[in-house]
Regions:
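Interaction/scaffold regions that mediate signaling and macromolecular assembly across diverse proteins
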Residues: 20-235
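Sec-dependent N-terminal signal peptides
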Residues: 3-14
Length: 235
């Protein structure tokens, strides 16, 4: 019996690794170093994406998984299903154009994971944000829009989650298209307004920003927020 359990566990691990590798390969092929997505070319690889989505549809994170493994799984699922949604409606100029029965892209129930069907909002807010005190989730999940933190051209894994999200947070905060930072004035992404509480659980917002900002921000800096660019993050 123990041998059977070990064989099944090994088989699951190998399948999980190979399917994540499929998604990783797709992102590496169709997403450039700045997070721009070639959706036109990605469209031709829908069959490969579907193999990964089929894996997600029958896989549930285990309760004994380490936190980073669980976060990587759900962030990958969010991003894969967001890409699927864009491809299903391609060509389009913005994810805001997607509507189904009066619901926007984030409230359409279509993302199948472990024999359940979720909305993107449920994955982000009810699973990732609710279960984990991790503000870097906001640079992991990607909303397919210009002002979103850039989409990484890789899949997340248990081993790379911390380093990759740290790198993405540094790029996001120091990207002048998404955040304009000086010592005494900061014009921030709306993400820091919408989800301010996620970034201030262990100090002020400026404390958080200074962990990643190349420019030291004064505690008395004036804060404003930039208009959000909802144009598609690619072509």
């Amino acid at each position: 019996m123990r041998k059977i359990f070990l064989i099944l566990s090994l088989s699951f691990f190998i399948n999980s690794f190979s399917q994540t590798a499929v998604f990783n390969s797709l992102l590496k092929t169709h997403v450039d170093s700045k997070g721009n997505v070639n959706y036109k070319a990605f469209k031709k690889d829908e069959a490969k994406l579907q193999t990964y989505l089929d894996y997600l549809a029958k896989t549930s994170p285990k309760k004994n998984w380490p936190a980073n493994k669980t976060k990587a799984f759900w962030v990958n699922a969010y991003n894969a299903y967001t890409i699927k949604l864009i491809l299903d409606n391609y060509p389009l100029k913005s994810i805001l154009k997607i509507k189904k029965k009066g619901k926007d892209a984030w409230n359409i129930k279509f993302a199948k994971v472990g024999n359940k069907t979720y909305t993107l909002n449920h994955i982000e807010h009810k699973i990732l944000r609710k279960q984990f005190n991790d503000p870097k989730i906001h640079v992991g999940v990607n909303c397919a829009s210009g002002s979103c933190p850039q989409l990484g051209n890789f899949a997340f894994t248990e081993d790379n989650y911390e380093s990759k999200t740290t790198d993405l947070m540094e790029k996001f905060i120091n990207d002048p298209k998404r955040n304009k930072i000086s010592e005494k004035k900061i014009h921030l992404s709306k993400i820091f307004e919408w989800f301010e509480g996620d970034f201030t659980k262990n100090g002020s917002l400026i404390d958080f920003l200074n962990k990643y900002s190349k420019t030291k921000i004064s505690n008395k800096a004036k804060i404003s927020h930039l208009q959000y660019d909802w144009n598609l993050n690619g072509k």
